[in-house]
């Protein structure tokens, strides 16, 4: 009888292992970024195991693990040169590391009704913390870059002549409230309002800006360029 139960246990274990068998698939995220995704062999729509986003063959942008399509544990995010810029613990929903912000293409404008009154009382008492995009300053913003391509009515203009600015309005709750792309060319200027419903819930989530510890609204503006194929990107 004991042998029988042992046989049943081993059989169940083998079936379980078979059900969890995984494979790695590759998917192009942008022109230069490729995803390597571990998925269930029985259902490639379920991410299970190691995830990597890389530039070229070996420059990592993001690495972490999935458990049935849910990000788990600590994920690591890098800049395009492979330098670590952020760690985020998805299991405990906690930012564990954020590199010093030295970028000159990101600009922030805060909206705080009581900012002026605080400044008049004690300017040194103002402490502002910028909003943080989970995923870092490159990988985390890829979903927004992918939503815009050069409009057909502007095909006759060289892409390198455009001045492109992404404008993201982040609520005090850390939610993306509005996304605009501003194009400038000589005397021409037009703002394109992007439908944020195309984004996943994760792609609309930020750690909000704060003023003296109080969450506030903030607009992130990013200076970008337009590639020859009409996509927007930034260095």
Language model feature labels by segment:
Residues 21-235:
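Charge-biased low-complexity segments
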Residues 1-26, 235:
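Bacterial Sec-dependent N-terminal signal peptides
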């Amino acid at each position: 009888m004991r042998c029988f139960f042992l046989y049943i246990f081993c059989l169940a274990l083998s079936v379980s292992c078979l059900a969890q068998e995984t494979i790695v698939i590759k998917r192009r995220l942008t022109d230069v970024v490729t995803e390597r995704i571990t998925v269930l062999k029985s259902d490639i729509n379920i991410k299970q195991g190691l995830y990597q986003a890389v530039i070229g063959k070996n420059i990592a942008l993001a690495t972490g693990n999935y458990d049935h399509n849910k990000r788990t544990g600590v994920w690591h995010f890098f800049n395009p040169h492979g330098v670590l810029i952020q760690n985020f613990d998805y299991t405990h929903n906690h930012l564990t590391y954020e590199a010093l912000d030295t970028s000159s293409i990101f600009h922030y404008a805060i909206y705080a009704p009581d900012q002026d009154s605080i400044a008049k009382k004690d300017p040194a008492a103002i402490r502002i913390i910028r909003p943080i995009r989970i995923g870092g300053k490159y990988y985390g913003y890829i979903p927004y870059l992918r939503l815009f391509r050069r409009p057909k009515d502007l095909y006759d203009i060289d892409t390198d002549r455009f001045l492109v600015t992404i404008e993201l309005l982040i609520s005090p709750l850390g939610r993306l409230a509005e996304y605009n792309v501003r194009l400038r060319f000589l005397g021409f200027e037009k703002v394109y309002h992007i439908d944020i419903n195309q984004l996943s819930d994760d792609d609309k989530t930020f750690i909000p800006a704060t003023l003296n510890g109080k969450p506030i609204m903030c607009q992130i503006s990013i200076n970008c360029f337009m590639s020859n194929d009409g996509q927007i990107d930034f260095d």
